[in-house]
Amino acid sequence: MEFILPGALTGSCPAWPPDVFAVAATLMRRTGSYVRCLATGGKSAVSLLDERWPGRAEAIGGAWRRAICAALKEHAGSGKTSLESALLRATLPPSVTQAWSTLCNRAGTSFGSCTADDALTRSLLELSGYADEASWSIGLESAGDEQDEYGQAAQLFLALNDKQSFCHRVHPQRARVLGKKHTPQQGLTLRSLTHHLSLCMPWEVEPLWFDLDSARLDDVLNLLLLPWPLEVKATDFQCVNSGSGLSELRGDSLFEYSRPSRPDSEVERWVLDAIERAKRQVSKLHAVVLPELALTRSEWKIAEAVAIRSGVMLISGIIDDTDDKSGLPMNSCRIQMMSLPTRPGAETVAAAPPPAFRQAKHHRWCLDRHQVLQYDLGGQLPSALRCWENSHIGDRRIFFAHLGGWLTFSVLICEDLARQDPIADVLRSVGPNLVIALLMDGPQLAARWPARYASVLADDPGSSVLTLTSLGMCQRSRPVGGGGAGSRVIALWKDKLYGTRELELPEGCDACVLSLARDTREEYTADGRSDGKATEVTVYSGFFPVPAGSARNP
């Protein structure tokens, strides 16, 4: 306890619920004692929580939040020091302080004995539940809502923690607490215990949370999918020497995928033309999405400027990025989401170009003999060797963004969907209701690997998944035995309510609009608490191919 929250054993119960949750959840994760929320078997196995627990947790959590809001409203000014002083004045519900005292009194209990200690385990479950109920909508509400003192404080603490945690006294290097969209409805893990708070351990992956509730988002979300490049040449793949000789010692090879950057004027014309053609299919467009390795850095800047002028988000893989520290080549994606129009009454986007978020790929692509033959690359890459992408693996981060009051999304790059460690724990803890996977892959058929891994995320935590590849790679992908035309299934959609859909571009079309809608469902925590049918599920709502324009596209 002292490691997570210095001074925990000598002071009173922390007033800020995410701090209390960080302590309780970390201890439950370390000991596995969260399983005691259920009667799991045996002649005398009894749940530590009775049938009145859901209502009691909601009432006490609500009282805790009201106490904090009252203290902040009466005593807080602006800034961290003022908030600290106000939180110290909050009068916490007796049930919260009693559970905290029980926990502190048993601080000497060994990890191996925790689960068998009824009083200790009950206090952990209660503190977690109270903090979760007190933190409804954390990270999911506008920071500018003057009527929500709790939400304003949460946003300030998030900013002070560099977008890594909503905690106040718990340092992000000890435990991180973020918001949450989905609660797993199968299995029993620590993630099953909360609706609103997620524990992210400060290990390999750094999660970052952005709340853009001021952005205007309708109940229908229209994404323009640009499966660029439309043509991929075999000569775009080249063997390279790493300089270290490590790959050669293992009997492997390295390759890079590259192509010349296109003129600025052409890129601007292509993106503008695609947006204009898409708006003939739908009246409103919210985002433009391109696959892995779709744009160079210079092309991104032009496309980003067009997106900002057009009031749409832009998400794309970058082909020629480099690591800031080492200068080595890096496979990454960039996300510009500040370009969305703001809702009435919200602050407008600044006149200067807003910064885009960059996320690096966490795993390298490996082409084996089967894939070299499948993509007809045998004249460029040695099919007898494993060919690894020449890409630097540096700091691992994952980005979560909340938009428009209901959408929380994150982005993965190809192998990061399939090789889910070490990112899976963070992704499942937060449970975004949309995951966008940018791929450099063959056709997105329901029988192939992207669909399998999308199904895993749809099951736990319940995320909807979009996978998108380039038409060029689809066309290069052929059965190894020969024969068959290249596929035009450039994307795949999976949600937990309505299943899987392949998105195929008809001949004569070079883009499509995917329409998504918000559906609501009720989810329960493992300790029996309902969210009141407040869970928002992103579901398929339509698919509209965009006929090719007269301009020569990439």
Give a label for each model feature.
Residues 195-216, 328-429:
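Active-site catalytic loop in hydrolytic enzyme cores
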Residues 43-231, 235-250, 291:
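Long, charge-dense tracts
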Residues 262-361, 451, 459:
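Cys-nucleophile CN-hydrolase/nitrilase-fold catalytic domain and related Cys-dependent amidase chemistry
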Residues 226-232, 238-287:
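N-terminal glycine-/serine-/threonine-rich phosphate-binding loop
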Residues 234-246, 342-354, 499-519, 523-526:
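Acidic Ser/Thr/Pro-rich low-complexity disordered segments
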Residues 4, 222-226, 410:
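Short, well-ordered beta-strand segments
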Residues 4-128, 286, 300-304, 308-315, ...:
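CN hydrolase (nitrilase-like) catalytic-core segments centered on the catalytic cysteine
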Residues 174, 179-201, 361-387, 398-400, ...:
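Active-site regions of metal-assisted phosphoester/phosphodiester hydrolases
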